Amino acid sequence: MKSVALHNLGCKVNSYEIEVMQQMLQEKGYTIVPFDEIADIYIVNTCTVTYIAARKSRQMLHRAKQKNPAALVVAVGCYVQTGREDVEQDPCIDLAIGNNRKKDLASILEEYLRDLEQEDAVAENAENAGHGVDKTLHDTTVIDINHTAEYEEMTLKQTAEHTRAYIKIQDGCNQFCSYCVIPYARGRVRSRRAEDIIREITGMAKNGYREIVLTGIHISSYGIDFDEEAWKRGESVSVLKEDEERRDYSGSSKLIDLLERIHDIEGIERIRIGSLEPRIVTEETAARMAELPKLCPHFHLSLQSGCDATLRRMNRKYTSEEYAESVALLRKVFDHPAITTDVIVGFPGETEEEFTQTKEFLDRIQFFEMHIFKYSKRAGTRAAVMSHQVPDPVKTTRSGELLAMEKEQSKRFRAHYLGREAEVLLEEIKELDGVEYLLGHTRDYVKVAVPLAENGEKAVTNTVVRGTVEGFVNDEILLLSPLEFSK
């Protein structure tokens, strides 16, 4: 059977999808090899969220063809969906598969290889034998993602991680932030049936996974495309209509309904949720989440800017004060929750005054972690044609200021644990400065280390350890003195 090398770029949704694709190929008998080795087929699951991500996608595709010019190079995902013309003209790409067709990867590959064999048989002595199949993109491999209401059902049985499994619960986004190309790459909101999610998580629990993370493109919109009456009957039936595509669905309680069902699954001890819109955090949803002991107090609330004028240009549908209220609600019902966020610097029109407002707001909120991004112009978005584009050197300076602020806030949050007890799910063994440690995370996702030499007999991966935090191993990792281990 042919050998296949896979490479993934981008978000946790992409990571989930490439693991499913690898699983499907293995079930079909393909041999999986590392991407830096010679393979018959190279598959790159691409990303296009920023210019750099798209460039890296192209680089990996070109690297594959350079590694083995005779190999079949397959581009999959978001870059294919948004860069159709570039993909068609790229001589390094033999086959392109868009989003919502990843579940059909194996069958598409088999059909392509059959066509290739027939072409080679006809042109056995011809100069162009070997890659004569027309790769022009068409609806069989790249669908019109903007006009599909069908969720692409895939199920993951195992994952590369030993303790934590990412579970995809929805795809697509209806928000159309002015800087973002993702709605065009992923299409409108399409939610996964709750029954399929529960079945997959139950299977993961039986396979020994103790922690799951719900992920998606815009998980705050989970369930907004379901028929209300069917949902009340316990059914997940999608009824998305063309004229409803751009409605604002944030604040849906169906995500909380789903969390409550997952909470009842035996064997799952920790539940995490991916990036949330701040508007989904209301008094009701916060109170309901607080009633779920398995739900980890770690919330990623996407901010992007602390300046209201910038938020309006971004088409973010909240104010900085509304964001602050959402954080306050979470801190009211959870004890010292970890709040993380994303911030974009150098958005078109961002003045020094607006940037100062953002800094002041970040200082006011105090985050556990902040992901700082320099604005990246994406073709086809409204922000790409806005006036007053910010020069790159200014973006770099502002990014540096926020990264320094992030480092201070993050260490301050971790320092809260000093002298306190913590519960850690151990995940891996790693050497740090010549010493071997077992590493894991607290419920609020602070990384903690346990010395392996002193506790090797008791401490193994996928074990829960409780103990007292004694200090820092480094700026990002706390040192735990174990008191109790439990399977």
Name each region found by the language model.
Residues 160-163, 173-174, 295, 305, ...:
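Short flexible coil/turn linkers enriched for glycine and charged/polar residues
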Residues 301, 342, 362, 370, ...:
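Hydrophobic, well-ordered secondary-structure elements that form the walls
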Residues 73-74, 82, 206-352:
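Conserved SAM/AdoMet-binding glycine-rich loop
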Residues 1-222, 229, 236, 254, ...:
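Proteins enriched for Cys/Gly/acidic motifs involved in redox and nucleic-acid/cofactor modification
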